[in-house]
Amino acid sequence: MRLLCRFLPLMLLGFVLAGCGPTKKSVFPPDVSIQQLSVRPGGQWHLTLRIQNNSYGEMDFSSLDGQLQVAELVPMRLHADFTLDVPALAGDVIELDVLPTTAMSQALQAIADKGSAGSLGYRISGSAVAKPEQEKKPRSFDFSGSNWISAVPGVAGTYR
């Protein structure tokens, strides 16, 4: 009993001090998707890419390197350097201009007149460089996802 009375305050102090330290926030890879695709005169695509931060802390994104594959065609490279601070469990966008292949442009044109009834599958994958809130150095996070885009009714050359 005497031994318990002597060490109990020390144990309680240890538990209290352990609870006072900063909690480590969980860090998860982001999701990247096409928020909007606009066809510019001359055939260039203007992509609005959404970067979704799935982590419990802010992430400071600085670059993206990956590929976009449309309708099982040959993928095209995506690369962008930028500065984007995305809060925890939130998303933000970057804009990127790319020159699609002829086959990609034809696949997109095939669904243009169908409005929201037509859709085109795509796959986007690669890595994004970001610095998590509680870390000193940026690191690379892999991402991969598939989705569909379709023409926006009444807005020519725009797909979501």
Tell what function each PLM region has.
Residues 1-8:
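Bacterial N-terminal signal peptides that target proteins for export
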Residues 16-19:
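C-terminal motif of bacterial Sec signal peptides marking the signal peptidase cleavage site
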Residues 21-24:
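Bacterial signal peptide processing site
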Residues 27, 39-79, 130, 134-141:
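Post-signal-peptide N-terminal segment of Sec-exported extracytoplasmic proteins
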Residues 31, 46-50, 65-67, 83, ...:
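Beta-strand secondary-structure signal
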Residues 33-44, 52-60, 85-88, 111-118:
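Short, solvent-exposed beta-strand/turn "edge" segments of beta-rich domains on protein surfaces
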Residues 71-107:
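Intrinsically disordered, low-complexity Pro/Gly/Ser/Thr-rich segments with frequent PxxP/GP/PP motifs
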Residues 102-157:
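Terminal connector regions
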